Design a protein with these regions (language model features):
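Patatin-like phospholipase
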Residues: 1-43, 50-386
């Protein structure tokens, strides 16, 4: 069974709590539009890896049910179900860093894995995923999912490794480029956790003989794995609004603003840039005579972005943060509009999560005609537009 001529790939990147926005978009596509992708490809990194893995795991139930189940899981989240928020855990995590930076050079340094203890997230995902590994294997072998790719950054080399699982019949081969590699694997919980391991914030994860960090770090070409896995149509879900109303700051930036800027650079910018590059490459390919194109083929991308700043969307829910974390955030800087971006990454609260899902659903609905045309070109089965 080869790759169909119009394989649709879904790119689910990271962004902490913001990644719930993806669910709203997919909920509209799978449930409201009734789009049933034929052997789709899912590529995930960071929190998007969790979403990609779950949808592939539950594909045998149908994507419309799988996305509803995933929305329910996200809606049940609280910050302390992702990482420990008790006073001792927070003080220990931050204190160990302070210790090593100050007196650690004079006495024995402490082994530090991360600021936050993410054991709750591990337990949550283990209870959901581990007992259903066999469903993922069956779904991929049956063709319900053409391929699943989970990206992580390899410490030491700095290479982005995309671990992928696909049927042997698919003909998908490993790939090696300058800073990127595609490596076949039986995808398990460790791959998901590695992809979501934000450096310093969450602990790195060991796979075979190497340690890995968040897959969005140094991911300069996030569309590349989808193309290597056979996607000729790519739907990406961005987390930065087109009309970003950012203004230069007049006062010296707070620590929370600095951290937010770094996170924005890691999570939000790469996919927008890569889509623009792909569109330009497509233009060049289209100008070539067909007999001169060789193996070159145009890739049809579509990127959905939020119509509203997801950072500002978090402000009405800032009091939902646990007291210990709120105390830490105040030490890093303002918790008003100036600190909204940082807040939006860690605000795993059902009220904010539901607001993100609803916003994603509304934005997909607003672009329903474009989406309908995009999927109809792929001969996907779907409901007629109202």
């Amino acid at each position: 069974m080869g790759i169909p001529p119009n394989s649709t790939a879904f790119i689910l990147s990271g962004g902490g709590a913001r990644s719930a926005y993806q669910l709203g978009v997919l909920k509209y596509i799978f449930s409201e539009m009734g789009c049933v992708p034929e052997s789709p490809i899912f590529v995930g990194s960071s929190a998007g890896a969790i979403n990609a893995y779950f949808l592939s795991l539950r594909a045998h139930h149908g994507f419309s049910k799988a996305i509803i189940d995933l929305c329910n899981i996200w809606s049940s989240l609280t910050v302390d179900r992702v990482f420990r928020t008790d006073s001792w855990s927070i003080v220990k995590g931050v204190g160990n860093f302070v210790y090593n930076f100050t007196i650690g050079r004079y006495v024995r340094q402490r082994h530090i894995e991360s600021i936050f203890n993410t054991e709750p997230l591990y337990e949550l995902l283990k209870n959901i995923i581990v007992s259903e590994y066999h469903f993922l294997d069956k779904n991929i072998e049956a063709g319900s999912v053409r391929a699943l790719g989970i990206s992580a950054m390899q410490y030491g080399t700095g290479r982005t490794i995309t671990f992928f699982q696909a049927s042997e019949k698919s003909g998908i081969q490993p790939w090696t480029l300058l800073r990127r590699e595609g490596r076949p694997a039986k995808l398990r919980l460790k791959h998901v956790l590695a992809s979501a391991a934000i450096p310093l914030v969450f602990p790195s994860v060991k796979i075979e003989n190497s340690y890995y960090a968040d897959g969005s770090v140094r991911a300069t070409a996030p569309l590349s794995p989808a193309i290597h896995l056979g996607g000729s149509k790519i739907l990406g879900i961005g987390l930065r609004t087109i009309a970003q109303q950012s203004q230069p700051i007049e006062n010296y930036p707070s620590m929370s603003q600095v951290i937010a800027m770094m996170l924005n650079t890691v999570f939000l910018d790469s996919i927008d840039f890569d889509v623009r590059v792909l569109e330009r490459v497509n233009e060049l390919i289209e100008k070539l005579p067909k007999e001169e194109r060789g193996k070159l083929r145009p890739i049809d991308p579509f990127l959905i972005r939020p119509s509203e700043d997801l950072g500002l969307l978090s402000l009405p829910y800032k009091d939902c943060v646990p007291k210990t974390l709120k105390f830490l955030m105040k030490g890093l800087g303002p918790t008003d509009q100036r600190g909204a971006d940082f807040l939006s990454y860690i605000l795993f609260d059902k009220h904010y999560i539901n607001a993100l899902i609803e916003k994603g659903f509304q934005d997909a609905y607003a672009q329903r005609e474009i989406l309908h045309h995009f999927f109809k070109k792929s001969n996907q089965r779907m409901k007629d537009l109202p």
